[in-house]
Amino acid sequence: MPKLGILKSKSMFCVIYRSSKRDQTYLYVEKKDDFSRVPEELMKGFGQPQLAMILPLDGRKKLVNADIEKVKLALTEQGYYLQLPPPPEDLLKQHLSVMGQKTDDTNK
């Protein structure tokens, strides 16, 4: 009887680096210390990459602050994914909006 070879699928990992210049900005690449596919201008603005973690993407359904499908697609197509910080909350605007709604409700 012929032996059946076991097919090994290539696991997908990403290496995540924290920016030394920009708070809450992260760069995801496929291999540790391989920034060969990252544009030079992006690297200048990013600063010295600081290793944050190595993360397996296979079997994972989501990431905390990034869409996992977008990350996988970007890694495959361009070799990196840049995670920018969320936009700042405008607490004053939110407060005034809520206060305006309360005023409108009492004037009816």
From Swiss-Prot:
Pfam families from the UniProt entry: YcgL (PF05166)
InterPro entries: YcgL-like_sf, YcgL_dom
Domain YcgL stretches: 12-96
PANTHER family: PROTEIN YCGL
Name of the protein in question: Protein YcgL
Protein's organism: Shigella sonnei (strain Ss046)
